[in-house]
C-alpha cells in the first residue's frame, strides 16, 4: 500500500527537522502548527525495528501537513565500508522504504559518518557507489548525508554519482560546483519533548532540490 501524497521538489528556505523518535499524529500536527514543514525519519539497515518509521507513522506525518523523506541508519562509529556492504545497505534501504509505502521518486538519504580512520578513501567511494546503484535502480533518488568522519574530501564527494547532498551540523567539506541541498543546524535541541536536529532546505548551485513526499492539506 502506497503512502498518501505526491512527490514534490523541496521549496528553498523551508524549516524542518530529523529525529530518531516515533512521531504520533498529535505530535506531527503540533510540529506543523509550530511552522515546521518537513521531517526525516529513519529506516533500518536490516529488518525494521520499532524505532524506525512505520507505514502508520508515515501516514500520520504526511496527513499533518509535514513533508517526509527517509534516511537510513548508520553503523556505530568505527565501521568499515565496502562495495558489498554498500550494495547490501542500499538494497535494504529500498526494501524498507517500499515496505513503508514510499513511492519511487522520493529522496532516500545515505548517512555517511563515523568511518574507521584507517579505511582507504576508495573503500568509502566503493560503498557509496554501490549504495547509490541499488537505490537508483529502484527508481528512488539517492541522497548523501555528509557527517563527521566521512573521510572523503569535497572533490571526492563531488566525484560520486550522487547529485543530492545534505550537510551535517559537523565540520564537513564544501562540495565544489554543486554544494548542498539541505543544511543541518547546530546544536541538536528538544522540541515537544522530542530530540531533533533542525534542517533547512535550499537549491544547490546546480539548481538541484531534494524530492519529498507531501500531502496538500490546504490553507
Regions found by a protein language model. Give the residues of each.
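Structural beta-sheet core signal
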Residues: 41, 70, 144, 166-167
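Active-site-adjacent substructure of cysteine-protease-like catalytic cores
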Residues: 124, 152-157
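Functionally critical loop-and-helix segments that line ligand-binding/catalytic clefts
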Residues: 1-21, 28, 33, 156-219
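Aromatic-lined carbohydrate-recognition surfaces of secreted/lumenal glycan-active proteins
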Residues: 135-153
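Substrate-binding cleft of extracellular glycoside hydrolase catalytic domains
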Residues: 6-26, 37, 41-127, 137
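A generic structural signal for alpha->beta connector loops
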Residues: 65, 139-141, 162, 179
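Flexible, glycine-rich phosphate/dinucleotide-binding loops
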Residues: 77, 151, 189
Amino acid at each position: 500500500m502506497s503512502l498518501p501524497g505526491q512527490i514534490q521538489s523541496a521549496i528553498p528556505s523551508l524549516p524542518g527537522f530529523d529525529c530518531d523518535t516515533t512521531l504520533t499524529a498529535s505530535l506531527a500536527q503540533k510540529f506543523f502548527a509550530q511552522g515546521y514543514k518537513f521531517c526525516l525519519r529513519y529506516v533500518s539497515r536490516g529488518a525494521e525495528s520499532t524505532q524506525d518509521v512505520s507505514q502508520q507513522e508515515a501516514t500520520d506525518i504526511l496527513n499533518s501537513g509535514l513533508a517526509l523523506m527517509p534516511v537510513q541508519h548508520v553503523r556505530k562509529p568505527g565501521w568499515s565500508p565496502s562495495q558489498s556492504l554498500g550494495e547490501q545497505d542500499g538494497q535494504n534501504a529500498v526494501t524498507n522504504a517500499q515496505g513503508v509505502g514510499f513511492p519511487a521518486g522520493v529522496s532516500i538519504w545515505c548517512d555517511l559518518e563515523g568511518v574507521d580512520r584507517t579505511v582507504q578513501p576508495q573503500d568509502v567511494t566503493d560503498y557509496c557507489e554501490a549504495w547509490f546503484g541499488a537505490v537508483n535502480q529502484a527508481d528512488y533518488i539517492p541522497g548523501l548525508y555528509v557527517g563527521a568522519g566521512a573521510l572523503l574530501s569535497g572533490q571526492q564527494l563531488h566525484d560520486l554519482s550522487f547529485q543530492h547532498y545534505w550537510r551535517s551540523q559537523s565540520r564537513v567539506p564544501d562540495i565544489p560546483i554543486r554544494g548542498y541541498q539541505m543544511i543541518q543546524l547546530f546544536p541538536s535541541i528538544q522540541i515537544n519533548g522530542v530530540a531533533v536536529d533542525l534542517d533547512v532546505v535550499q537549491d544547490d548551485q546546480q539548481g538541484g532540490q531534494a524530492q519529498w513526499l507531501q500531502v496538500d492539506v490546504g490553507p
